[in-house]
Amino acid sequence: MSIPIESAVPLLAVFDVPRSIAFYRDALGFEVANTSKPFTDAQDDYGWAMLRLNGVELMLNNMYEDNIRPSEPDQARVAAHADTIIYFACRDVDGAYATLIAKGIAASQPKVAYYGMKQTYVTDPDGYKLCFQWPAGSN
């Protein structure tokens, strides 16, 4: 018998939750669905957040306990995230690309992968790769 799983929600360990919220909200259109209490008096200094867009959920978590973090991200840690890719099903890959470019987000030119998916990629502030893809020719 299988386990009746209904969904999966990635949790990304990030350097600065408010900075990541701003990226996913402003660049991609996610809404903040839930947050932890702020770590400090700054009302947006959350350690955890749940984001939603069209039924897609994504969690962000501060990679440092009690918001004690260095002044700059650890570049080795950011580089280690480069092998993590989140794939989003997106019918209009060209439209997503145009929207990202218009918002000043560096995105790869859409192309069809050898396995038939049209894709464009971006990298978030913590080095995680995001792919927007759809089967080529099936819009």
Protein language model regions, located:
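Active-site beta-strand termini and strand-to-loop segments that position acidic
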Residues: 50-54, 122-125, 135
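Vicinal oxygen chelate
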Residues: 16-18, 79-126
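A short acidic/small-residue loop/turn micro-motif
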Residues: 66, 114-115, 135-139
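Short, P/G- and charge-enriched loop/turn segments at secondary-structure junctions
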Residues: 36-38, 71-77
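N-terminal beta-strand motif that seeds the catalytic metal site of vicinal oxygen chelate
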Residues: 1-22, 83-86, 135-139
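Short beta->alpha transition motifs characteristic of CBS
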Residues: 34, 121, 133-139
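Core segments of cupin and vicinal oxygen chelate
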Residues: 11-58
